[in-house]
Amino acid sequence: MNRLPDDYDPYAVEEPSDEEPALSSSEDEVDVLLHGTPDQKRKLIRECLTGESESSSEDEFEKEMEAELNSTMKTMEDKLSSLGTGSSSGNGKVATAPTRYYDDIYFDSDSEDEDRAVQVTKKKKKKQHKIPTNDELLYDPEKDNRDQAWVDAQRRGYHGLGPQRSRQQQPVPNSDAVLNCPACMTTLCLDCQRHESYKTQYRAMFVMNCSINKEEVLRYKASENRKKRRVHKKMRSNREDAAEKAETDVEEIYHPVMCTECSTEVAVYDKDEVFHFFNVLASHS
């Protein structure tokens, strides 16, 4: 009986595996075609027909896909750019204000050195300075002038100055103050006269944003305000003294005046249609 050698290993298998077949000989290729997996057969057929491995073919495929993607993106960008220029200049549906620029005189300099530099670069294209819009400035420079013109027109209308006269013949009437509501700052009067004795009181005939409460009546005795007339009583006759005494007993009637925005009482209204303001904020002009 033959004896096995000492270095014999019954588990050693020297055959090539199915996953990584040795494709160096024709027998291995036949074995792959007969017993290999579909992936192994596909790789073998591709290599035999094209002479290229799987990795090289995949690189070529990726290059083709990338080139196709680039061409597609370029085509789409060209279409978008053509649509943008066509909509802005062709149909003109979206109307935009024309861009305004400053005059060159605003940027002229009196310096001789700068004038020489300007002469050197005179042939170059002049740089235009764009005038920013009110939206870009977040400010309207002409708003104050328009508001002042409106106030002046209101004051002229109060005094019967018509628009047919020129501005030189229409001086703006003087006003002691512009009256505002102390609670909500609403403008109440643009043309008023200040009281001679009480500096915080004003009277006016033309008001705005004011409502008169005719249902409520305020009574005030006039005799207290006419004490100074008693100095001249000795110079008058008895008939005049009796008439004055009857007049002093008459009460003056007023109606309260409220702000239309917040209903704050700001003035009183007398029988002569004159407003007497006592609870206001005055902007002295």
UniProtKB/Swiss-Prot annotation:
Which is one Gene Ontology cellular component term of this protein? cytoplasm
Q: Which residues carry this modification: Phosphoserine?
A: 17, 109, 111
Nuclease listed as a keyword: no
Top-level taxon in the UniProt lineage: Eukaryota
What Pfam families has UniProt attached to this entry? Eapp_C
Q: Where is the composition biased (Basic residues)?
A: 121-130
| In-chain residues carrying the UniProt-annotated modification N-acetylmethionine | 1
Provide this UniProt record's keywords sorted from A to Z.
Acetylation, Cytoplasm, Nucleus, Phosphoprotein
Give an example GO biological process.
Answer: positive regulation of transcription elongation by RNA polymerase II
Write out the biased-composition intervals (Low complexity): 81-92
Location of the protein in the cell: Cytoplasm; Nucleus
Q: Which residues cross the membrane?
A: none
Q: Which InterPro entries does its entry note? A: E2F-assoc_phosphoprotein (IPR019370)
Q: Does the keyword Acetylation apply?
A: yes
Let me know which tissues express this protein, per UniProt: Ubiquitously expressed. Highest levels in heart, placenta, skeletal muscle and pancreas. Lower levels in brain, lung and kidney. In the brain, expressed in all regions with high levels in the cerebellum and cerebral cortex. Expressed in COS1 and transformed skin fibroblasts.
Residues that the record marks as modified (Phosphothreonine) are 37
According to its UniProt entry, what is the function of this protein? Answer: May play an important role in the fine-tuning of both major E2F1 activities, the regulation of the cell-cycle and the induction of apoptosis. Promotes S-phase entry, and inhibits p14(ARP) expression.
User: What does the record note on quaternary structure?
Assistant: Interacts with E2F1. The C-terminal half binds the N-terminal of E2F1. Also interacts with E2F2 and E2F3, but not E2F4.
Its protein name is E2F-associated phosphoprotein
Species source reads Homo sapiens (Human)
Record lineage: Eukaryota, Metazoa, Chordata, Craniata, Vertebrata
